[in-house]
Amino acid sequence: MGVKIDRVAWQSGGRTVNLILWDLHGEDEFQKMRMSYLRGSAGYILVADLTRKATLDKAIQLHMEAQELLGPVPFVLAINKSDLAADAEIGQEEIASLTALGWPIISTSAKSNTGVQEAFARLAKMILEAP
């Protein structure tokens, strides 16, 4: 199982939010271990690959498990690889249905660094505004 940890100080509304980023990967047999890393989290970002529908299904599953573990903490769904829209397997109707359920969704491209900062800014703002 791979875990990459980074720290980022984020400014939002004149306040500093110190984000500790846990990039959790791994196969399904490590799922329970990965979820244990979430304990105490104030929020999270889920990432789905626009060109692989299965990653959206997995993100939805992870969200349900995270909400069960953490309660209703802030989250953002980043739909990555927006630069590969021609190869999309995730349709606009699927994104619209999640948006209608209140999911904050941001289109991103790690390759072109589009939307990535916006995703972190949105999460930081949501954490600061959480009750």
What residue spans do the PLM features occupy?
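TRAFAC-class small GTPase G-domain
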Residues: 1-131
